[in-house]
Amino acid sequence: MTYAIIENSGRQFFTEPGKFIDINHIKAEVGDIIYFNRVLLLKSNNLIEIGYPFINNIKVKAKILKHFKDKKIRVYKMNPKKGTRKTKGYRSLCTRVLIESIENTENIIN
């Protein structure tokens, strides 16, 4: 089993070929190929490589599947004994990407 842990927008994601992840919105078209080069950890066969902070020469290739809005986050504010209540909602834009492969500059791992 080959997998990698990548960093994108300050968040870490467990990725392996054939899986999809939901990340913050990326300004690209559906069907475009993108590369993540901030790889924190790579496991291939029985070899584990940890970056300090990132692993050089490793890229994760992904394809953009769709853009969508995430679930609504509700923020509720209330002042006790005053009778004031406020509810606000927010839906962030997200992008779903399909992990196609984990690539090395010399050869393709998977």
Swiss-Prot record:
GO biological process terms held by the UniProt record: translation
GO MF entries: rRNA binding; structural constituent of ribosome
The keyword Ribonucleoprotein belongs to this UniProt entry's keyword annotation: yes
Keyword Hydrolase: no
Keywords: Chloroplast, Plastid, Ribonucleoprotein, Ribosomal protein, RNA-binding, rRNA-binding
Membrane-traversing stretches: none
GO annotation, cellular component aspect: chloroplast; mitochondrial large ribosomal subunit
Role of this protein: This protein binds to 23S rRNA.
Miscellaneous information on this protein: Although originally identified as Cyanidium caldarium, these sequences derive from Galdieria sulphuraria.
Complex formation: Part of the 50S ribosomal subunit.
Protein name: Large ribosomal subunit protein bL21c
Organism: Galdieria sulphuraria
